[in-house]
Amino acid sequence: MKKLLQAKALILALGLFQLPAIAQTQMQADRTNGQFATEEMQRAFQETNPPAGPVRAIAEYERSAAVLVRYPFGIPMELIKELAKNDKVITIVASESQKNTVITQYTQSGVNLSNCDFIIAKTDSYWTRDYTGWFAMYDTNKVGLVDFIYNRPRPNDDEFPKYEAQYLGIEMFGMKLKQTGGNYMTDGYGSAVQSHIAYTENSSLSQAQVNQKMKDYLGITHHDVVQDPNGEYINHVDCWGKYLAPNKILIRKVPDNHPQHQALEDMAAYFAAQTCAWGTKYEVYRALATNEQPYTNSLILNNRVFVPVNGPASVDNDALNVYKTAMPGYEIIGVKGASGTPWLGTDALHCRTHEVADKGYLYIKHYPILGEQAGPDYKIEADVVSCANATISPVQCYYRINGSGSFKAADMTMESTGHYTYSFTGLNKNDKVEYYISAADNSGRKETYPFIGEPDPFKFTCMNETNTCTVTGAAKALRAWFNAGRSELAVSVSLNIAGTYRIKLYNTAGEEVAAMTKELVAGTSVFSMDVYSQAPGTYVLVVEGNGIRETMKILK
């Protein structure tokens, strides 16, 4: 079992470590040629209406149906072979002739052709991360593609998303912003991180207007635009940071005497101080780049993580071990670049691949119970959505107490369509609970949350203490935080009496602006409240019933 829970590090021996400096300089020049989108590209871009709400950007660490690469390749053949072992590889080719050439190369290299498909479309470069579309859920249970103005003067690349959407059979939405995929990462809860070029390259718009478009088209209501700490020509977030999970982020680390050292340390401290969507501070992980190794420029593809490595081996192994520590249960695979297209500090594996979301995604939304919490009982909730319009069954909570034995499965109760609950009962003080949620549907899909399930479950400790007072502001009894997008208010409440409670939200004028009724346990319950339509400002949250009234002030 222990071996099953450990990530496996696999180094693929793929050619030389580096090109001569002159060749590296040429690659950088190719990537930045002309620097910005042409005026003709901007004029030709067709903006569409935004997707119907609710809109939610899909994170890289969620379920993927495939990965996009482009021929001629910027990645080694051994990487494609490894990708195609478990996942679908979609190769962009310019013609049937190119397709046949690639099939021959794949066959000769032992690539699993049953996991390969092709899109025939003209493109200008192999940086699929930068110009292919961004995926979002919309209209409750649909997956769509969001296009943008590619911020480089490559018209064929800029046109590609329409072919991508046609191939996938999904709706494409045109968001009239200059963007690039290497400068975008989202947590799946309404937050996105980008460097400052998200604003400076859209200088005709105010920052508020840029933020509004990100909200309308992607559901991003916390647009975290930061000054790029690398200070390089590219200004892409994937050159220094990466979301690994809703509560985990990887930040590049360099030696103390490196000119970027302080800026990167400041960035790590910035994220360590932020509250993630689960209500805890981010876990910040660091990968030391002793010689510009691009360790944050990795690809998460379902339960595997492909990390670019350049050597020396000891430094590579340290970086891979950081991933293994942060992502237990995932297979961590180190990949060396090809001799003709090596990994650079500002251009590596993530830049040259792009995950493709599952249009029939079985999505689980959950705000977990974490840390020390009052008991004796604990209630969790989850929303489960089938984007394939399939019948969902079963939805279960897998759990174990004090690390004893295997995880046990318990059916969750469907309280309303797509909304499920489960209560932990009979726990003792100091019991340590591990749990994850599992769902399946009749399309054959099965998902767990957290994504990896058993190797990295949610964990909480039962304190068996309930708050018996009814004094306003008892923080021990009532805690609330916004998801990163501030569209939902997550509430954790500890009570000494089980029963029906009314949860209400008041504005500063004393007007009730939102309300819901919940069955809560004697102990800790965690649930969420829709506050998407509420304006920024100060509110009072009230939980009352059964002779108990708990209140707290919150700022949106």
Swiss-Prot record:
Its EC number is 3.5.3.-. It comes from the Bacteria. GO terms for cellular component: extracellular region. Keywords: FAD, Flavoprotein, FMN, Hydrolase, Secreted, Signal. Residues 1-23 form the signal peptide. Its main location: secreted. The active site is at C351. It is found in: Secreted. Inhibited by cysteine and TLCK. Inhibited by high concentration of thiourea and thio-L-citrulline. Its cofactor is FAD; FMN. InterPro entries: Peptidyl-Arg-deiminase_porph (IPR007466). Residues 24-43 form a propeptide. Optimum pH is 9.3. GO terms for molecular function: agmatine deiminase activity; protein-arginine deiminase activity. GO terms for biological process: putrescine biosynthetic process. Belongs to the agmatine deiminase family. Deiminates the guanidino group of C-terminal arginine residues on a variety of peptides, including the vasoregulatory peptide-hormone bradykinin, to yield ammonia and a citrulline residue. May promote the growth of the pathogen in the periodontal pocket by producing ammonia, ammonia having a protective effect during acidic cleaning cycles in the mouth. This is Peptidylarginine deiminase. The lineage of its organism: Bacteria, Pseudomonadati, Bacteroidota, Bacteroidia, Bacteroidales.
